[in-house]
Amino acid sequence: MIDESPYRLQLWLYPLLLLTLCGSVQGDDMHLRDTFTGKPQERWRFVTDQVMGGVSTGNLRFEALQRQNFARMTGNVSTKNNGGFIQFRRQMTAVSGSNGVEIRVRGNGEKYFVHLRTSGTVLPWQYYQASFDTTDEWKTIRIPFRNFVGSSDWLSENVSPPSIRSLGIVAYGRDHQADIAVSMAGFF
């Protein structure tokens, strides 16, 4: 009689190994650049100031043009009722040694913001913020972490890359029409 136990063990180990490897790839995806391929609607979330009584409106669409995928956020930002933002964000972590945020954008000439939330931003209105300007041409923008400013004095002065939990693209702080497209968001 042949002992089949080693074969049973191998049959059991292969699926376990495959699941482990797939899990690692998904986990690594949280700190890679997002180029809005696959199912970006499952990674990115659209939020307005209506969650706190504001009246800003907008939407987020995922589009493709000339083999380039991108997210496009449009809307009306209103500061009425202590509001003033629309945004889209996703969970994303930076690896140790990252120096900043890198995005590829085009827009309607308005100023926009990148918001980072970290393990230290526990209240909904806490974030680190840096601004950038858009044009109607695609351009890559790099924003060093040292340029991000905390939304309150309670936050640490500097952003620590391993503490980053999410990245958001935000139209914020003044009455205006938002129209911004992002084809890549991540860290450098």
Question: Model-flagged regions — what are they?
Answer:
Residues 14-21:
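Bacterial N-terminal signal peptides
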Residues 1, 18, 151:
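Short regulatory "switch" loops immediately downstream of catalytic or recognition motifs
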Residues 3-14:
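Bacterial N-terminal signal peptides that target proteins for export
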Residues 25-188:
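Beta-rich carbohydrate-recognition modules and glycan-binding surfaces
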